[in-house]
Amino acid sequence: MATSDVKPKSISRAKKWSEEIENLYRFQQAGYRDEIEYKQVKQVAMVDRWPETGYVKKLQRRDNTFFYYNKERECEDKEVHKVKVYVY
């Protein structure tokens, strides 16, 4: 299967915050499912991350505007249930 053909097999909602959920939240705020879809659409090999935390630092939306994120956690507890977790 080609990389561009990767589709999720299932989806669930996040129950509690983790570093993985934090990064998924950032991708979904920018309009992508996750890092896999972002890399497919934008044709990039690496995503800008904060070296201290490993969280996503900057994402380019589909309309070519940029989202910039802080080093600290941005996904509040009340937002966690909105994050979709895709399984491939």
From Swiss-Prot:
Pfam families the record matches: Meiosis_expr
Signal peptide: none
Consequence of gene loss (knockout): Mice are viable, but males are sterile, producing only a few sperm that are morphologically abnormal. Spermatogenesis is dramatically impaired at the stage of elongation and condensation. Spermatozoa exhibit failure of flagellar formation, disorganization of sperm axonemes and deformed heads.
InterPro entries for the chain: Meiosis-expressed_gene_1 (IPR020186)
Coiled-coil annotated residue ranges, if any: none
Keywords, in A-Z order: Differentiation, Meiosis, Spermatogenesis
GO cellular component: cytosol; manchette; nucleus
Gene Ontology terms describing biological process: manchette assembly; meiotic cell cycle; protein localization; sperm axoneme assembly; spermatogenesis
Entry comment describing in which tissues the protein is expressed: Expressed in the testes (at protein level). Expressed in the ovary. Several isoforms have been identified differing in their 5'-untranslated exons. These isoforms show different tissue expression. Some are expressed in various tissues, including lung, liver, brain, testis, oviduct and oocytes. Some are testis-specific.
Family statement: Belongs to the MEIG1 family.
PANTHER family (alphabetical): MEIOSIS EXPRESSED GENE 1 PROTEIN HOMOLOG, MEIOSIS-EXPRESSED GENE 1 PROTEIN
Quaternary structure, from the entry: Interacts with PACRG. Interacts with MORN3.
Function: Essential for spermiogenesis.
Name under which the protein is recorded: Meiosis-expressed gene 1 protein
Organism: Mus musculus (Mouse)
Organism taxonomic ancestry: Eukaryota, Metazoa, Chordata, Craniata, Vertebrata
